[in-house]
Structures are given as structure tokens and as C-alpha cells.
């Protein structure tokens, strides 16, 4: 029977000093026999997805203590990608994922905590905490802050989100008044941005991995139903502790739950719902932390057989996360995948003995449970607020239309191939990724002329100066994990291409990455990256590039001999940008770049460089 990890600091004569300090935090004699459960919160006033989390850690703490545990809360950092975007702040976004993972490890191991409740929400916070959970492999449960309500304005017939505000701002034909109206309407409440962007994608994937409660990814941040998720998480983590430490039940540990099959389930969900390409990066990173042999080839394999069953902004303007919830949330998509014979349903979760059991209970098309139906009727109130659980609005009906609704059956899928694809070729030998859900079918095969930019900044200037024409393939390089450093998101270049009317007339290829808000023929994560000697660094202005999504290929139409000669020349010059970039690369960023791997490895640290230390 495993001992509580916390016994290291709570038991024995020699730990009198440690116990004295524990007592100073409020612990009593009886508490030293209970599991100490860390609450990793990520409250910050910088991020709308986290601004409402301040008191939620203590909400969970009280429930943990009622259930027989001792709760100790700490905080991690959280970067807002939208606010950090378009300037050097974006250099820090992806590196913050590693800092968050380390922070959770540091706090949990330094204080010998027995389990963790991860209160996350936005882009790098959920992945960072997931990496830590799989690294530590002690009982864990995730509960996120929830999605924002979609914005509303009389100037648009559809719901708004952050991307709408960015696109309209770049449209030279839009009046200042229209831009101001979109700006004030796009992000009306607390919560993670309302489309299927990175934050919401990752929170949905924690459900598929089995590490979060049903509704975690889709219940609105403002809705009173979300409070119950936090309360249930507090009770559940104590139960998981009892099963592991009291009954030696290792099936409750993160690596037992989030195994190879669970990672396949998560990736199949991502493909089926057209999630952010960033999720590929983060799943690969989490798999490495959990020592799961899941890689880009597995994602490529799955992308060829999973249909797209859900389409949400930015891939379609009609639906946002509140509509996914009304259609039954993530377990309705998982149910469709299960009935299609794809999902692994024999896996345990933190809340059910098996995924099959959970689907039977939570898929609205399979259950008559009125409480479940009521839960998924939770909807938006349309009232601007930064307060969690502040409204109890419900839809009159559910969206259970699997032919024409937000979530579809296999027979009525949006497309028979899913919303994400991995491409390989001489320009990306280790692969690159594209969100096909956001690509118009007319350009699934695209041959274009390379237009080279050595940074995101120069690409933005070129696009706005009309240097990019229809038929061009914008190449933005030296923006990978090592070359950026930090692998910036390219939402501004894609938004500006869209505002220039080039969304269906151009492509963009980069060793950087894309926001979950990106759509269009935007191909990222080109690996190896330019700074690591990748062939994207050998492309020249005027070269022809052929993109073929159906055949999963991307090739520079240059002979092998010519590429070899260019490589010799580039080796002599060094693999660095041809232009001087006015960005300040600090010691912190240099330290990140030193150990960073390319995107096909999840941009995690190169552990081989640390061997022997």
C-alpha cells in the first residue's frame, strides 16, 4: 500500500519543524493523517479566461476538507496570447508552458503533496498543468474556468469572438465606429475566447483523456452549473486519493488513465471537432511527459480515418462553444465516435469506471436522464460580466439534430476526413500541420509562388503594404521554438490576409504556429525548423511550392541537387535570419531556445542535452 507522500513532512520526531510550519498554515493534529491536496490555481487579472478564478480555489478547498482531505492552494502564471500577440510578448507564450509545468512540479514535490486539482483555462495553462500531472503521476483532476459567451452586435447576424475584432480592424473599408462596436462586443464576459480556439480545444481534450468531468470544456464560465463542476472536483480528488493510497488502486493515476489509447481518443476528438493545431503540439508534449509513445505519425494515421463531426468558430461563424454545449458537449461527440467504431471505450476516467459507462450516462442522444438534459440546456445570458456562475439561463430545447445541427453523426459528417491533417515533403521532412476544417475545399490542392519573410513582423508589413498577391505562398521562417525563440502564433498575418480578400487566394507556411483562431490555408509547425537546419530555410523568393492536402504532401518544386547546393551555401552562412530583427531576446528566452526541440516533438526540452547532469 503506498504511503501518503506528505508523510515525509508530517510524520516523525525529526519533522517537528515542518509540522510547526504546517500548523502556522492552519493545520491541526488530526490533519496530519489526511492527504494533502494541492490546488494549482491560475488566477490573474491579465487574462479574461482567468480573471474569475480568484475565489474558486477556495471553493474547491472547502469541498476537499468536507470530504476528508487537507487543501493547500498555490498559483501559477498565465499569459494571455491575444494580448501578447502582435509584438515581442508572443515570444513568451509557448515558453510559459514549460514554466507552468515546472512551477506545478516544484510546488507539489517541494511540499510532498499527495494529489492535485488543476484549475486551468487558457492556451498554455492547461497544457502546462497536463504536462506536470503526467510528469508527477499522482492523483489529479482538471477543472477549467470555462468558455466565454459569444459576443453580440446589431452589425452582425452571427456571434462574435476575438478574431472578428482583429479582422475588422485590419479591413481598411470598415469605419472607426464599426471597429469600435466590434471591439466592445467581441469579448463580453469572463472565460476563454468563445470559439474552438486553443484554450477550449485543450479543455475539451482533458475530458477525452479522462482527466476532467463531463462539461469541463463546454459549460460557460458565467453559468451557475459550472459551480457544481468545481464542487464535484473537490470531492472526486479525495475519492481518488482513497483509492490509490488506501486501496493501492493504480488505475486512478494519470498515466493509467491517459495512456496511449486515451491519447488516441483525445486526438480523434480534436480531429472530429476541428480543434486548434496547437493541440497537436501540446498533446505531443504531454505524451512525452507521460512516457507515452504517441507521435506525429499516429496523428497522421488518425487524421485519415476520423470524419469532422463538429464545426465551430473560427471554422464556421454559426456556432460557438455555447452551441457545442447545447448539442450535448464533448460526450456527444465521443458518443458519435464510439458508434462509428473508432473510440476506445474500455478506458477508465476520473469519474467513471469506463468511457463506455460515461457515454451511456452523458451523451444526450443515449440517455433519458432529465438532469443530464437540463445540464446541457445551460446557455448564455448576454450580460457583460467578469463574475463566475452569475447567471442561470437555459435554452428551451437541446440541439439533438445529428443531420444538420452543431454536432453530426457519421452519416451526416461535415466531411469524411477530419479537421486536422499532417503533411510531409521535402520542405518539411518531419511534418507540418494544417487545420483543414478552416480551409476552403477549392484550395485543398494549391500550387503557389513563395514569398519569403524572415519574421512575423516583416510578413505583417508586407501584407499590409500589398506586397502579397493572389497565388502567393507566404513563407514565414525562423519563428520556430528555437529560432523565434518561442514559436510565435501567426494570427495577425492570417487575419490580415483575410482582410485583404486573400483568404482563399493565398497560403501561409511557417515553422511558427497558429492561434486557434486561425482559418484559411495556414500550415504551421514545419519541422525541422529553419534554425535547426530545416528545408524551410532553403526556400527562395519565386520558388514554386505544391500543397496537396488529400495526399498529405507539401513539396518545394526544386531538384534535390539544387536543394543540396543551397544547403551547402546555408551551412556556410549559418542558419539564422537574413534580416536584422529588432527583437530583444532575453536570458530567459535564450535558456528556453537552448533546449527547445522542433514542433514535431512538441517543442519540449531536449532531454538528451541534460543527460549526465
Swiss-Prot record:
EC number: 4.2.1.9
Residues bearing the modification N6-carboxylysine: 124
Name of the coding gene: ilvD
The protein's name in its UniProt record: Dihydroxy-acid dehydratase
Keywords per UniProt: 2Fe-2S, Amino-acid biosynthesis, Branched-chain amino acid biosynthesis, Iron, Iron-sulfur, Lyase, Magnesium, Metal-binding
Keyword Magnesium attached: yes
Pathway: Amino-acid biosynthesis; L-isoleucine biosynthesis; L-isoleucine from 2-oxobutanoate: step 3/4; Amino-acid biosynthesis; L-valine biosynthesis; L-valine from pyruvate: step 3/4
UniProt-annotated binding residues for [2Fe-2S] cluster: 122, 193
Annotated residues for binding of Mg(2+): 81, 123-124, 489
UniProt remark on cofactor binding: Binds 1 [2Fe-2S] cluster per subunit. This cluster acts as a Lewis acid cofactor.
Requisite cofactors: [2Fe-2S] cluster; Mg(2+)
Record's function text: Functions in the biosynthesis of branched-chain amino acids. Catalyzes the dehydration of (2R,3R)-2,3-dihydroxy-3-methylpentanoate (2,3-dihydroxy-3-methylvalerate) into 2-oxo-3-methylpentanoate (2-oxo-3-methylvalerate) and of (2R)-2,3-dihydroxy-3-methylbutanoate (2,3-dihydroxyisovalerate) into 2-oxo-3-methylbutanoate (2-oxoisovalerate), the penultimate precursor to L-isoleucine and L-valine, respectively.
Organism: Pseudomonas putida (strain ATCC 47054 / DSM 6125 / CFBP 8728 / NCIMB 11950 / KT2440)
Any Pfam family: ILVD_EDD_N
Molecular-function GO terms, alphabetical: 2 iron, 2 sulfur cluster binding; dihydroxy-acid dehydratase activity; magnesium ion binding
Lineage, broadest ranks: Bacteria, Pseudomonadati, Pseudomonadota, Gammaproteobacteria, Pseudomonadales
Amino acid at each position: 500500500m503506498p504511503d501518503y507522500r506528505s508523510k515525509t513532512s508530517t510524520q516523525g520526531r525529526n519533522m517537528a519543524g515542518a509540522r510547526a510550519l504546517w500548523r502556522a498554515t492552519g493545520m491541526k493534529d488530526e490533519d496530519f493523517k489526511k492527504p494533502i491536496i494541492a490546488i494549482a490555481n491560475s488566477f490573474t487579472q491579465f487574462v479574461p479566461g482567468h480573471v474569475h478564478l480568484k475565489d474558486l480555489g477556495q471553493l474547491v478547498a472547502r469541498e476537499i476538507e468536507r470530504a476528508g482531505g487537507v487543501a493547500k492552494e498555490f498559483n501559477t502564471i498565465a499569459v494571455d496570447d491575444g494580448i501578447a500577440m502582435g509584438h515581442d510578448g508572443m515570444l513568451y507564450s509557448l515558453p510559459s508552458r514549460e514554466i507552468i509545468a515546472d512551477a506545478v512540479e516544484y510546488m507539489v514535490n517541494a511540499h510532498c503533496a499527495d494529489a492535485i486539482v488543476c484549475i486551468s483555462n487558457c492556451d498554455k495553462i492547461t497544457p502546462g498543468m497536463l504536462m506536470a500531472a503526467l510528469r508527477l503521476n499522482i492523483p489529479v483532476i482538471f477543472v477549467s474556468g470555462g468558455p466565454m459567451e459569444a459576443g453580440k452586435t446589431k452589425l452582425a447576424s452571427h456571434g462574435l469572438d476575438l478574431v472578428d475584432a482583429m479582422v475588422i480592424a485590419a479591413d481598411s473599408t470598415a469605419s472607426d465606429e464599426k471597429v469600435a462596436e466590434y471591439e466592445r462586443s467581441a469579448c463580453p464576459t469572463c472565460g476563454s475566447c468563445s470559439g474552438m480556439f486553443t484554450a477550449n480545444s485543450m479543455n475539451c481534450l482533458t475530458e477525452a483523456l479522462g482527466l476532467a468531468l463531463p462539461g469541463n470544456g463546454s459549460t460557460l464560465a458565467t453559468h451557475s452549473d459550472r459551480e457544481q463542476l468545481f464542487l464535484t472536483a473537490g470531492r472526486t480528488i479525495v475519492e481518488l486519493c482513497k483509492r490509490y493510497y488506501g486501496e493501492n488502486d493504480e488505475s486512478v493515476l494519470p498515466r493509467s488513465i491517459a495512456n496511449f489509447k486515451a491519447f488516441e481518443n483525445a486526438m480523434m476528438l480534436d480531429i472530429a471537432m476541428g480543434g486548434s493545431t496547437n493541440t497537436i503540439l501540446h498533446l505531443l508534449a504531454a505524451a512525452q511527459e507521460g512516457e507515452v509513445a504517441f507521435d506525429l505519425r499516429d496523428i497522421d494515421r488518425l487524421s485519415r480515418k476520423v470524419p469532422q463531426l463538429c464545426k465551430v468558430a473560427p471554422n464556421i461563424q454559426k456556432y460557438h462553444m455555447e452551441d457545442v454545449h447545447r448539442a450535448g458537449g464533448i460526450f456527444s461527440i465521443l458518443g458519435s465516435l464510439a458508434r462509428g467504431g473508432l473510440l476506445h471505450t474500455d478506458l477508465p476516467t476520473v469519474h467513471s469506471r469506463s468511457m463506455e459507462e460515461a457515454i451511456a450516462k452523458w451523451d444526450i442522444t443515449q440517455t433519458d436522464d432529465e438532469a443530464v438534459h437540463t445540464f446541457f440546456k445551460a446557455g448564455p445570458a448576454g450580460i457583460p460580466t467578469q463574475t463566475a456562475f452569475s447567471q442561470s439561463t437555459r435554452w428551451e430545447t437541446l440541439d439533438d439534430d445529428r443531420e444538420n445541427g452543431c454536432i453530426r453523426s457519421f452519416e451526416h459528417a461535415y466531411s469524411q476526413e477530419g479537421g486536422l491533417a499532417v503533411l510531409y515533403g521535402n520542405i518539411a521532412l518531419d511534418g507540418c500541420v494544417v487545420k483543414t476544417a478552416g480551409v476552403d475545399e477549392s484550395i485543398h490542392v494549391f500550387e503557389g509562388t513563395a514569398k519569403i519573410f524572415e519574421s512575423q513582423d516583416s510578413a505583417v508589413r508586407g501584407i499590409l503594404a500589398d506586397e502579397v498577391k493572389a497565388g502567393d505562398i507566404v513563407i514565414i521562417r525562423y519563428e520556430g521554438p528555437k529560432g523565434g525563440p518561442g514559436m510565435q502564433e501567426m494570427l495577425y498575418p492570417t487575419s490580415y490576409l483575410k482582410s485583404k480578400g486573400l483568404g482563399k487566394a493565398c497560403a501561409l507556411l511557417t515553422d511558427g504556429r497558429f492561434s486557434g483562431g486561425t482559418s484559411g490555408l495556414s500550415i504551421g509547425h514545419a519541422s525541422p525548423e529553419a534554425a535547426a537546419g530545416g528545408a524551410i530555410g532553403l526556400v527562395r523568393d519565386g520558388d514554386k511550392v505544391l500543397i496537396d492536402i488529400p495526399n498529405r504532401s507539401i513539396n518545394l518544386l526544386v531538384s534535390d541537387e539544387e536543394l543540396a547546393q543551397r544547403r551547402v551555401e546555408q551551412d556556410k552562412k549559418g542558419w539564422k535570419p537574413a534580416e536584422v530583427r529588432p527583437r530583444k531576446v532575453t536570458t530567459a528566452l535564450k535558456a528556453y531556445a537552448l533546449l527547445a526541440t522542433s514542433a514535431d516533438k512538441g517543442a519540449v526540452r531536449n532531454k538528451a542535452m541534460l543527460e549526465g547532469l
